[in-house]
Every structure is written in C-alpha cells, then in structure tokens.
Amino acid sequence: MKLGCFFSLIDYSGILHNHEKNLIFYFFAVLIMRIFDAHTHLNQEDLFPNRKEHLEAFATVGGHGLVNIWANRQYNTNGLTISNGSRASFPDLWIKASLGIHPCDVGNAIGNVEEEITLIKQQIETNRDLVVAIWECWIDLHYPEGASFLGLQRDFFRAQCELAREFNLPIVIHSRDAFSETLEILREFKDLVIYFHCWGYWPDEIKVLKSEFNQLFIGFTGNISYPKAEEIRASLRETNLSQILLETDAPYLSPQGFRGQINSPAKVSIVGKFAAETLGISEEKLWAQVEENFWRLYRG
C-alpha cells in the first residue's frame, strides 16, 4: 500500500494535524526502507561491551547490513566475534568484518610488514565467510607524527592492497591530508575495488578518482551535516549515485544535533536524511541505491 493511500484511510475524519502526519509518514517510511552502515566500529571499546543494544537500535530504525572495520589485532578479533556471535541473536542482520592494520599501530612498530600481513592472511583464511574487505589501507598526514613514518605507511598500504588482490576483496581507504600520496599508490592497483571511506576532500578530488578508477565507491558520514562542511556536501553532489555509500564511522562523527556524543550505527538513518536533502532526492530513492551499492561493494 502506498503511504498516500494509507493516510487517506487513517485520516478520513480530518483529525490529524500536519505535524502528526509528518511524524507518521517518517515512521512508516523508516519501516519500509532498508538502511546500511558501510563503515562502523562496534568492535572498539566504546561500543563493544554494549554491542547487542547498538545492534537492536540499528535494527529498529530499519538497519539491514553493516560492516565492522578496524585494524589492530584485538579489534580484528572483536569484529569477527561480533559477526559470529550475532548470527543467532540477529538472524535478519547482515554483519561482516574487515581486517587490516591501522597506521597508529604501524607507528608503534607492533611488527614488521611481513609478520602482520601473515597474521591477517591467516585470519581471513580461517573466517573467509565473515571477512568482506581489507582495511586499513591508510595514508594519514594530518598530524606531524604521520610524516615521520610515511615510508612505513606506504609499505603497509601496498602490502594490504596485494592482500586484497590475492583474496579478491575490496580495499577500504582512509586518506587524510594525503590525497596525492594515496593516489600514487592506488594507481598501482587499478584492478581493485576501492572504497574511500569518510570523504574529507573536495569535489575536484572526486573528479580525479572518477576519471581514473572504474570500481569506485565514496563513503559519506555524519560530517555532511556540519554547517561548515560545504566542501563535503559539494563532493556528495559530484559523486555518481551508483558510487555513494553511507556510514557512521561510529563511535566518531555523530551528525549535527548529536555532536559530542558517542555515535552508533543507528544514526546512519540521520546521515541518510541529510544526504537525501543535499542531493534533492527522497530518502527512499537514496537508500534503495545505497543498498545496491553496498551489495556490489561487499558481495561483488
């Protein structure tokens, strides 16, 4: 039944006010939309202890699929624990994991490249049905210390791209204040499916990526709602609908109205609202396209 027909039935006496109709419309719209968080961190200590409650909240707002992404030994293990442990409790949720190495751990010299890649490879082989991407393929020069181990970041980046190639998995990219350095490496791996998470550059960089990479996805998170983030909203408008993914990056980057609070996967519904407004399309149309994109990225 279309929502318009529904309203004609429940409001035959004209007793509903406009704001009540809007609330009811939004409630039922959420019920018929399937939403997806392409990048979250339930495996992190801020969220992991209460992961069941966060998953329940996600399901309540129409959540259907999410991918837990992090990149050190403990968080990789936690991500696999969530995927395994949620099968019985949340049979209708598609919950998978991404494995990799975070550059902070690279800087802490937790191990050499070969040792860490071997460990990740073993985890993938043991949990092949749960692992859907390689992360963290990362070049980050936002803080001064990033430049001090740029060479090691590059080594791990290339090694993880090779791992993605070996297992035919997409790579999830974090790039901050390092677009040219990131692009230099990605040009060596144009055969891979590339997901730029938490977009933080300008529309011109979107144009460069679109012109060079055929298998490209761009992730937008709660920062598209920030008043001063016009360059990110402009980047969203520059991105093809077939390339857009939505994410929370929880527990980080809560959308406007919730800033300063711990983020959670359920708030991806709010990201979708802001994104649809920015694009000038309905939330239903956006989420239908995001669902298609989500499956193309993570299921191939």
Feature map (PLM): residue ranges:
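Mid-domain alpha/beta scaffold segments of enzyme catalytic cores
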Residues: Y12, N22-G300
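Short, low-complexity, intrinsically disordered N-terminal modules
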Residues: I15-L16
